[in-house]
Structure formats: C-alpha cells, structure tokens
Amino acid sequence: MPYTDVVIHEIQRLVDIVPMGVPHNIIQDTQFRGYLLPKGTDVFPLLGSVLKDPKYFRYPDAFYPQHFLDEQGRFKKNEAFVPFSSGKRICLGEAMARMELFLYFTSTLQNFSLCSLVPLVDIDITPKLSGFGNITPTYELCLVAR
C-alpha cells in the first residue's frame, strides 16, 4: 500500500494543521542570513513554510501525491516533510500518529465509498483562521457502505 502512504503524506503536507513548531532557544550567538541571533533568543520554527517550499515540492499549493513518489512509483522520503517538527523536539507521538492515520484511512476506504455533498470544484481548503494552528473550512461527506 505504498500509494496510500504517499496520499497520507501529501494530505499532511498540504493541510498543515499546526504550521508552527515548538520553540527552540538559541544556545550560542548565531549568524543567520546576515542577522545576528543572540544567545537566549527564542525561535519558533515555521513548519508550514518548509512544507510549501517550491524547492522541495514541485506544486507546493496543490494536492500532488507524486511529491512522495520516485521514478519507479515507490515511496520517496523528502527532508522537507516535517509535519511533526524535527530535531530534539520532534513530536514524541509521531510513530503512533502515523500508524493510526494509516489504519484509520485504510479501514475507512476499505469499508466505505466517500461521496462529497458539495461539488469538488467548490471545495476550498484555505484556512479560515491561521496562527499557531490552521482552522480549515468544514465540509459534509457521505460514507456509503461497500
């Protein structure tokens, strides 16, 4: 089920519910892009900016699962895919969250057909509110038993 994994990754990348990581504290004076960041400065990583970086994602604002496929159609890791943050402060529940997402997604699709109650062209996932978290619009979905 490599394509299922690819689709889940692309959903996480595109929807980006938590665009800001947990704060980090600079432990020594650091030069970054011509700026001095003094020791003790709090830095908030903007994960959303990485997840939509055209340097790493060919179509950053579109749903394009091929972002995570290699030429042979196999899953390909992408260093810019950091929905759970990175480094020492990565989400401790990442492995469990990935497993649960996969199981929930696959069991739902195995047992139901999904039908949108709104024409697909009218669905806009642009966040209604953005800040520490992104709040996307809600849409109704009909699950039809297979």
From Swiss-Prot:
> In its UniProt entry, what is this protein called?
Putative inactive cytochrome P450 2G1
Task: Kindly give the Pfam families that the UniProt entry links to this protein.
Answer: p450 (PF00067)
Cofactor(s) required, per the database record? heme
**Keyword hit for Metal-binding:** yes
- List the residue ranges forming a coiled coil, or say none: none
This protein's record includes keyword Protein biosynthesis: no
Q: Give the family this protein belongs to, as stated in its UniProt record.
A: Belongs to the cytochrome P450 family.
| Superkingdom classification of source | Eukaryota
Q: Write out the residues that bind heme.
A: C91
Native source organism of the sequence: Homo sapiens (Human)
Query: What's in the keyword line of the UniProt record?
Result: Heme, Iron, Metal-binding
InterPro entries, per this entry? Cyt_P450, Cyt_P450_CS, Cyt_P450_E_grp-I, Cyt_P450_sf, Cytochrome_P450_fam2
Q: Which SUPFAM superfamilies match?
A: Cytochrome P450
Q: Name one GO molecular function term.
A: oxidoreductase activity, acting on paired donors, with incorporation or reduction of molecular oxygen
Annotated gene: CYP2G1P
